[in-house]
């Protein structure tokens, strides 16, 4: 089994240092999204006392030329703390902090999608948009081969692995359980986990979260996942289709509702929202993975519990549709719906913002409106359309 060398270090030796008292000092780990739009980075500093609110954590900086975010001649970037969590690795009173990234001129970095998302969420605060995101991922050895799979072959066909139990059906549960507990300790709104259809593939769910909290909590949950995997010497990939062939891909199904959908008669509002989404399918495909639909073109094939990237569809309890209305929601007449199109490596800020823009702000077409100056600008420009994406 291919695991990292660092995972073989004696953790007992490390533990004796972790137990040392640290006085009044507090370690704060700043976490941010790098220039790929997928990776997370972190660095830690010492504060003189435990921060009680996010406002007590100072801004910081980092070398953006080493994170694909700046040139070496003008490399300093700003870290702006926005959400604070408990640190499950160094324990209380130490903290993890989710940060926005600003450039030298204090404008948002290109991959800082939180900045605009927060403004949009504040605009629709009265609608109380709730989200729950189902993060699928695949465990790999450091050689890039799925963890637990035969070195020179494949496991048996899909069927016994989903929510499976037993050493011959699930691989890496120690990672999953450790991540779950670490998220609970941190204050992440994690609400469940399960083994997925492909062996070595897992899912955890975060939510319900209102507004901007969805992106903050999912990104920090991803960071914690990568740190837990680091301790175990394995890798968690969010690739939407890590294995070609007759294997399921990995998505980030997004459950969504507004206050009007969650009360009696809400099904009508759900249906209205789905109709709006159907008219803007191409736009959503472009923002549902970091490569403008290229990644999802490998996953959304109409097979393996996915819809076709070329067509919009919706149905009750239909996991082969773009939008699924849960059976209970259809029966009770209110609740939420599930958008099954976002890829596992999507940016939750982009996904949640797009849902709000289309269903609440009634935006249409491929352009998103800049509500500050009234001018429209297109995030879809330069991105592959879903029809073009199929050729990549």
From Swiss-Prot:
What GO molecular function terms would the record report? Answer: ATP binding; glutamine synthetase activity; metal ion binding
Compartments it resides in: Cytoplasm, Cytosol; Microsome; Mitochondrion
| Broad enzyme group | ligase
GS beta-grasp domain mapped to chain residues? 26-106
Q: Name one Pfam family in it.
A: Gln-synt_C
Q: Which co-factors does it depend on?
A: Mg(2+); Mn(2+)
Question: What SMART domains does this protein map onto?
Answer: Gln-synt_C
Which reactions does this protein catalyse?
L-glutamate + NH4(+) + ATP = L-glutamine + ADP + phosphate + H(+)
Keywords associated with the record: ATP-binding, Cytoplasm, Endoplasmic reticulum, Ligase, Magnesium, Manganese, Metal-binding, Microsome, Mitochondrion, Nucleotide-binding
What the entry lists under PROSITE patterns is as follows:
GLNA_1, GLNA_ATP, GS_BETA_GRASP, GS_CATALYTIC
Name where it mostly resides.
cytoplasm
Q: Which residues bind ADP?
A: 336-338
Q: Which residues bind ATP?
A: 134, 203-208, 255-257, 319, 324
Q: Name a single GO cellular component.
A: cytoplasm
Q: Where does Mn(2+) 2 bind?
A: 136, 196, 203
Similarity section: Belongs to the glutamine synthetase family.
Quote the function comment for this protein. Answer: Glutamine synthetase that catalyzes the ATP-dependent conversion of glutamate and ammonia to glutamine.
Protein name in the entry: Glutamine synthetase
What lineage does the source organism belong to? Eukaryota, Metazoa, Chordata, Craniata, Vertebrata
